[in-house]
Amino acid sequence: MHPPSITQLLIILLIIVLLFGAKKIPELAKGLGSGIKNFKKAVKEDEEDNQSEENTKSQIKQSESKNENVSKTHTDSQKQDT
């Protein structure tokens, strides 16, 4: 699919001006811009939350494996003592 031509863009712009009026267009653009900004911010925060959850899970796994190693070493040393 090819991008719209200049003529098509001008017709779309004219329809928008007729529907909303010239005074409302800056307000609509501002609202659209802030909406996009908020969406990007939410996506970034979600990615950061997911990353921190992954880091926490990996830290828990590392701690569990260390605890298992310590427990195994302790059990082995008790067996050697008897």
UniProtKB/Swiss-Prot annotation:
Lineage of the organism: Bacteria, Pseudomonadati, Campylobacterota, Epsilonproteobacteria, Campylobacterales
Composition bias type Basic and acidic residues, residue spans: 63-82
Keyword terms of this UniProt record: Cell inner membrane, Cell membrane, Membrane, Protein transport, Translocation, Transmembrane, Transmembrane helix, Transport
Function field: Part of the twin-arginine translocation (Tat) system that transports large folded proteins containing a characteristic twin-arginine motif in their signal peptide across membranes. TatA could form the protein-conducting channel of the Tat system.
Gene name of this polypeptide: tatA
Superkingdom assignment: Bacteria
Complex and partners: The Tat system comprises two distinct complexes: a TatABC complex, containing multiple copies of TatA, TatB and TatC subunits, and a separate TatA complex, containing only TatA subunits. Substrates initially bind to the TatABC complex, which probably triggers association of the separate TatA complex to form the active translocon.
A single MF term (Gene Ontology): protein transmembrane transporter activity
Region annotated Disordered, chain positions: 42-82
Compartment annotation: Cell inner membrane
Family label: Belongs to the TatA/E family.
InterPro entries listed in its UniProt record: TatA/B/E (IPR003369), TatA/E (IPR006312)
Membrane topology label: Single-pass membrane protein
Transmembrane spans: 1-21
GO cellular component: TAT protein transport complex
Entry keyword annotation includes Protein transport: yes
Protein name according to UniProt: Sec-independent protein translocase protein TatA
Keyword Protein transport tagged: yes
GO biological process: protein transport by the Tat complex
One Pfam family named in its UniProt record: TatA_B_E
HAMAP family: TatA_E
